[in-house]
Structure formats: C-alpha cells, structure tokens
Amino acid sequence: AEVKLGSDDGGLVFSPSSFTVAAGEKITFKNNAGFPHNIVFDEDEVPAGVNAEKISQPEYLNGAGETYEVTLTEKGTYKFYCEPHAGAGMKGEVTVN
C-alpha cells in the first residue's frame, strides 16, 4: 500500500487517510509535496502489545519523493498523525486484517 503525505493539490492530508492492509503487507509513506511531514503512531490507538514508537517515523521526510516503509503484523486498527500538521487535520488510520 502506498500513502501520500500531502494531496496532489498541496493539502495537509494523508492520501488515502483510511485504508486496509493484510498483516505483513508493506506500507510505503511517500512525501508528495515537499513539505516536512512525519508519521507518528498514537500509542493509545494501536493494538495491545504494539510498540508505537518502533513503527513511527518521527524524523521529518523533507523532500518530495522521500519515503518511509513500515510493515505491521498485529491485526487491528492503528491511528497515526503528522506531528507538525495534526492540528490541521493530518491524521489517518490503517486496519490490519
């Protein structure tokens, strides 16, 4: 699954913001617009036993085309956000089944 950081028109969103993957399927977050974005999983909004810190990318992806890849193996719903733009609504969720 590929998730864009920033919409094609420059909006501060994850695109798609809600999606489903199979357990063990690789997710690629790709900076689409060249604004600094990061991917932080909410420690209170991941399946029990999952270390949110280990699957997050707190360092900024600054340039267009920069990517962060993560593979989630525990089934359930994971919520994530972009730290600098969470207030603007840059949040998302992935369901692993």
Swiss-Prot record:
CDD domains given in the database record: Plastocyanin
Localization per record: Plastid, Chloroplast thylakoid membrane
PROSITE patterns in the cross-refs: COPPER_BLUE
Residues engaged in binding Cu cation: H37, C82, H85, M90
Pfam family, one: Copper-bind
UniProt cross-references to SUPFAM superfamilies, sorted A to Z: Cupredoxins (SSF49503)
GO terms for cellular component: chloroplast thylakoid lumen; chloroplast thylakoid membrane
Topology relative to the membrane: Peripheral membrane protein
Gene Ontology terms, MF aspect: copper ion binding; electron transporter, transferring electrons from cytochrome b6/f complex of photosystem II activity
Lineage top rank: taxon: Eukaryota
Keywords: Chloroplast, Copper, Electron transport, Membrane, Metal-binding, Plastid, Thylakoid, Transport
Positions of the Plastocyanin-like domain: 1-97
Names of required cofactors: Cu(2+)
Keyword Membrane among record annotations: yes
Family, per entry: Belongs to the plastocyanin family.
Protein role: Participates in electron transfer between P700 and the cytochrome b6-f complex in photosystem I.
Further information: The sequence shown is that of plastocyanin A. There is only 1 difference between the sequence of parsley plastocyanins A and B.
UniProt name for this protein: Plastocyanin A/B
The organism of origin for this protein: Petroselinum crispum
